[in-house]
């Protein structure tokens, strides 16, 4: 995945960037504030209220591999978040008391 630079208005924000790859999957990037020292990340969608939540974990059984803030999710995830004519999106994230990061898309 090619890391893309976020628009200036998001430069200092805690965020998740999602980009549709050539294969249709979702190439994702989270900022340093989100990723911490864990090696895996869990991503969940609630399509009814259009929210995403992320949580870091040390368990490979629960999450996908996180490498320097980048990770890949299946194409169905990308189709849910990105309309057909949109290649990428930036979602601002906020940490909740339950240790999950939440954002709206």
Residue ranges and their predicted role:
Residues 22-37, 67-84:
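Short beta-strand-centered segments at strand-helix junctions
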Residues 31-34, 54-64, 104-105:
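Secondary-structure transition/turn motif
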